[in-house]
């Protein structure tokens, strides 16, 4: 394979390529060697699969998504607690179930503002670095919403949902077997 531009900048970096799609059968194996998972997937089934796998494997998830002129970034680590001992939420605490197909347009159908991809991606990378280095204020327990047309950012406080089917008090999701692949 061709040399990576990243290796040219830092020859000490170890790059691992996975030439496969993430699926229920391989999700836990794919993320097992990593401390943090950065999800920038463009479809709901993958987002939910990655969230569920990260929860089951006790991995921190830094999520980012965009559509049209809006973006969202959040850090999920429901296996950890905040300063007062309350567990952090997972993705399903905010978005319980994937929406029915066709309820929301895809990025290909609706389009995305190219510059917003860079902005949201840079914020996601910053959150990953903050988590790895243990610096700054984590976005765990928050949803950062970026509205490009109004040049506005909002931080929305989110809490663990005791009724969450994954991390709640009586979870019904205990593995990835419900995913169709």
Which residues does each predicted region cover?
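Adenine nucleotide-associated cytosolic modules
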Residues: 1-181
